[in-house]
Amino acid sequence: MRWPCSSRFRGLWPEAAPWAVLLALGVPGWVLAVSATVAAVVPEQHVSSAGQAPLDWLLTDRGPFHRAQEYADFMERYRQGFTTRYRIYREFARWKVNNLALERKDFFSLPLPLAPEFVRNIRLLGRRPNLQQVTENLIKKYGTHFLLSATLGGEESLTIFVDKRKLSRKSETLGGVPVVGGTGNSSAVSLETLHQLAASYFIDRESTLRRLHHIQIATGAIKVTETRTGPLGCSNYDNLDSVSSVLVQSPENKVQLLGLQVLLPEHLRERFVAAALSYITCSSEGELVCRENDCWCKCSPTFPECNCPDADIQAMEDSLLQIQDSWATHNRQFEESEEFQTLLKRLPSDRFLNSTAISQYWTMDANLQHRYQQLGASLKVLLKKMHRIVRRLFNLCKRCHRQPRFRLPKERSLSFWWNRIQSLLYCGESTFPGTFLEQSHSCTCPYDQSSCQGPIPCALGEGPACAHCASDNTTRCGSCNPGYVLAQGLCRPEVAESLENFLGLETDLQDLELKYLLQKRDSRIEVHSIFISNDMRLGSWFDPSWRKRMLLTLKSNKYKPGLVHVMLALSLQICLTKNSTLEPVMAIYVNPFGGSHSESWFMPVNEGSFPDWERTNVDAAAQCQNWTITLGNRWKTFFETVHVYLRSRIKSLDDSSNETIYYEPLEMTDPSKNLGYMKINTLQVFGYSLPFDPDAIRDLILQLDYPYTQGSQDSALLQLIELRDRVNQLSPPGKVRLDLFSCLLRHRLKLANNEVGRIQSSLRAFNSKLPNPVEYETGKLCS
């Protein structure tokens, strides 16, 4: 006799088997129950119908549930398309079966009437049997449990299998057409109708079945099955609704089993429990071991893979492969959907669409957004199911020699779909479209396709992108943005023309060459200038104490206004009388392009990285030295006038620290107390002169107000910006560059202040429109 799976077990550990085998107890003259053995379960393979979700997680060998008739009926209906089941049932019980042998032992304290063969097998085990002996002599012959009590009864049920797709189509077709039953009542064919009919089955059975059969014939969307079961002659159902009926749902009316170890001697009980658990859990292929909340089978040498259920693992791996196929199918259906194809047709073809432009069209399409959300919901369900299977798969493979083989699909991001649209637009000239690469504006074609790239329109945008595509050929630019010029269908940065006609700024004089020429005092790098001073004359001795500060001026351009000069070095030859304690101190002011003395900048000698004076002896007898400060190519600057303020200080030796100290001399009224005399032989500026055409620059400025074409105005602005930057680049060192360009306009072109301001504003406005504009702050030098 086989008992239902809802039976209750007592006596074994919680890891006991989900079903049990009943023990035969012999009583003199009669048999209480017959023994049963475990039947080998044959796995049933099911294949789900096309277009429906697989049920492989149910199809492996998991016990008697898969051999039940109810499960077989469900799978059969599922293959036919009925995805939903409604079932209403009631159970009844009338006969209670108890183990009389146990009652006899409990009430009368009599020994159990065990079968002689069972007792003989116990004695054959001895005092310390191994698990294999217990399994062979007891478990395989008598099972693991025996019957304690049970309730016998039956069941009456009504099962309705529903195909929701057919039901919804029939409802839309019929609309409000009534479904007439035997009683004349009418209602729409819907799930609510089925709910009401199922609920009224036990109240009015005949009428309910008649109406359900009518719906089944009319729609074909449901299958109705009526089941009545009951053991031991329970074929009379007339009084099922009477008060004497007992429902099996009550807790006391379940099958109760007791572990067989309670019948064994004390020394065999623990070994029997271990053998029973190993037999049930490990299928006699190993020994069950439990440690630290984890149990596994210690495999015997004959079955080294007893912990590795290959059939279950293979079934789960197959399920993961099917989910991957479903994942790819969902993505393909989204790409082939009406919403996606509609977006492709709406995209403009007269210009190139980058990812940002496609994302804007994507965001504005509400229907596509809704369809994309549906795709995400479907993939989320698949991913959740896949994670669940993967967790179970890793648990099963925890003690396997091989690791599971699977690949988790990744959800495609929005950027993937935007690139997919680009690929369909620009790489679809073959059977299978290639992959578009936005960085290189090219296509990567499939290996079996020689070419898949179609015409790619020009890209519109700022900077080097096109302002408009050509009307006759959309792959080429028709016009460009400010700061760029059209060349062979492409926009290239517009470069200012050469400034040689206005101001020659190029030189190839290197620092080593300059240093060599300065040592030789080469006249080829000397800038001719006029020496002016009211305090002294060149080549004459003078008393430095006569004035506290003397002004020496070198002025160029007095007779050559068509040149501007660049200073690379400044040199003075200073002579002192013998035993003189005076030391010359010079402050240098440079005026770049003329104007008042206040429009000069101070030279920061020996401050930061700025060079210091270099002194070389010329005449030891007269104590003459060349004082030279070399600016080089790094610190070179424009000059028109150089002002040298000469002071003197007294050099002395500190006896305490053995260091040289300087202090200012006092004004001497007595000539006999003179501290020495000084003589300046030469004052020279070394550098080079640049050709300068003020009239050409004025003509260039006139094009800002009276352009011949827009291109000529842009070209003039570019040249003026280039000239401004090149001039200001020779600004003296400091935190902020000085605005030498305004000084050039003000003093060499003789422009008014408001005219200079207007030109600077025009240059700043045009420069802001150029690609990668470079703006820098400048300090005011000229008023």
From Swiss-Prot:
Residues 1-33 form the signal peptide. Transmembrane segments: none annotated. Residues 85-281 form the MACPF domain. Its main location: secreted. GO terms for biological process: cellular response to retinoic acid; central nervous system neuron differentiation; locomotion; multicellular organism growth; negative regulation of cell cycle; negative regulation of mitotic cell cycle; nervous system development; positive regulation of neuron differentiation. Keywords: Cell cycle, Glycoprotein, Growth arrest, Secreted, Signal. Glycans are attached at residues 185, 354, 473, 579, 626, 658. It is found in: Secreted. Expressed in olfactory bulb, cerebellum and neuronal layers in hippocampus. GO terms for cellular component: cytoplasm; dendrite; extracellular region; neuronal cell body. InterPro entries: BRINP, MACPF. Inhibits neuronal cell proliferation by negative regulation of the cell cycle transition. Belongs to the BRINP family. This is BMP/retinoic acid-inducible neural-specific protein 2. The gene is Brinp2.
